[in-house]
Amino acid sequence: MANTKREKLFAEFPPVPTEKWEEVIAVDLKGADYERKLVWRTPEGFNVRPYYRAENLEGLKFLASEPGEFPYVRGTRCDNVWRVHQSLTVKCPEAANAEALKLLDSGVDSLGFSLTKGLSAAEVETLLRDIHLPAVEVVFSGEGVADVVEPVLAKIEKEGWQETASVHFVLDPIINRLSLTGAFCSPGGEKCFKMLAGLVRRTAAMKGVRVVTVSGENFSNAGSTIVEELAFTLSAGHEYLVRLMDEGLTVDEAARKIRFSMGVTSNYFMEMAKFRAARMLWANIVKGYNPEKGCSCKLFAHAVTSTWNQTVYDPYINMLRGTTEAMSAAIAGVHSLEVTPFNASFAEPDEFSKRIARNVELLLKHESHFDQVVDPAGGSYYIENLTQSIAAEAWKLFLELEEKGGYVAAFESGYVVERVDASAAAKDKSVAQRRITLLGANQYPNFTEVASDAVTEAAVTRRKKAGVLNPYRGAMAFEAMRLHVDRSGKTPKAFMLTAGHLAMARAR
C-alpha cells in the first residue's frame, strides 16, 4: 500500500512575515527613499511593488474562477491551443491561392487575406480553392473586404460549412476608418451599422463567422499606453454592441459576431495581464445586458506583435522582439496570433522574413509546448496583481468615455487622440533620453551598418495628420538622422566642448 502521508518538506524554513522583509530591505537601502528606489511608477497610472506575496492576492474576486468559467480571466477555453496566423496581400487570386496553400503546408492554420480591391464570386472561388474552411481559419481585410463578404458567405453555404467554417471579416468603421482617417467608411455614418447588423443576421446560422473586428492594435502602434489601448478597444467594442442592439439585434446575436484584435508590445508581463484583464472586463460589459447564453460573454482575441518598437537599423533584433511578444500572447491565451515579419517596417516581407515569423510560433508550440498549459500565469502573485491593476485603470478610462457619450463621441470631441498623442509624446521623450531602450537605434547601434537600399525616407518619416490616430515607430527620429548621414556619403564631425571646472574634470 502506498504511503500517502504528505511530508512537510519546508518545516525547517519557518514563514517570514512581510514586516521582516521590509526591515531587511530598509537596511539594504541605507537610508535611500524606498518609493523612489524600488516602486515602479508605470505610465499606465498605477504603481508596481518590488515584490508580491500571497497576502497581496486577498480581495481579488476573480481568483476563484477556472479556465472556461466566467469572468474568463484564465481563458475562455479549457485548452491553450492558438491558431498560427499569417497574412498575405491579394493582388492576383491565383498567385495568392498558391501562396496560401504553401503557408498551410508550412504550419499556418489561420490565413489573412489583405485585399487591395473587391473580388468577384469567381475570383473568390479561385482564392479559396483547396482551402477547407472548417479546418483553416480565414480572415479577410483591406480595401476590398466589404465586397467579398457575400461571395464568401455564398461559398460557405454552397459547401455546407455553416456549422463549421471559421471565417472573419475586418469590418471596423469605428477604428480602421473613423479613428485612422477621420471619416466613416462609405456609405457613411449610421448606414455602416445598419450594414453590419444586416451581416449579423445574414450569418446567424454560421457559428464560426464574425463580421466585426475591433482593431485595437492601432492604439498601441500610435503610442498609447497598455491601459489606453485596452480601454479604447473595449469602448469601441461596446459601441458596436450598443449600435447593433439599436438595430434590433439581441445582445447574444451581436456579441457573438465581434472579434477583437490587439497589439502585443515587449512589456512582457503587462501584456499577459492585459489580455487576462480584457477577457474579464468584456465579460462583465456583456453580462450587464443580461444575455441568455453565458458563452456570449466570451471575448474572442487575436494578437499581432507590435510595430511601434521595430527598427530599420539592426533589423534582425526585431526577430527577438517578436519572440518575446509572441510568448506574452501565447501565455495569455489568445485565440490566434500573428508575428510581424522583422522587415515589415521598411520592405515588403519576403519568404525568409515570413518563414522566421511563423517559425517563432511553431517553436513555441512544438518545442516549448506553450499550447499544453492553460493559463500558466494563473496564481502568480505578480501577474494576478497586474491583471487587477490594469483592469481597474482601464475600467476607469472606459467609464470616462461612456460619460462622454461612448467611443465615437469621445473620438469626435478630440479626447481619444489627445490622450494617445500625449502618451506618444511621453514615449518619444523617454526614447530620446534612453529611458526606453530600442536596441540598434538609441542604444548599442551597429556603427558599421549602412542602411540598405530597401530603406526609404518614407520608412523613417513620421506621418502627423491632425485629429486622427497616427501609427508610427519609436525609433523614427534616430533613424531619420542616420539615414540622412548614410545618404549624404559624408562622415559627420562632432566638436567636443570642455565645460565646467578643469580641476574637477581631472579629479580621480
Predicted regions located by residue number:
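Mobile "lid/hinge" segments at catalytic clefts and subdomain interfaces of large enzymes
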Residues: V200, A204-L241, T323-F398
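Conserved, mostly hydrophobic/aromatic
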Residues: G45, G107, G160, W282, ...
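Catalytic alpha/beta active-site cores
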Residues: A2-N267, E271, Y289, K298-H302, ...
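N-terminal glycine-/lysine-enriched basic segments
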Residues: N309, P341-A347, S368-Y382, R473, ...
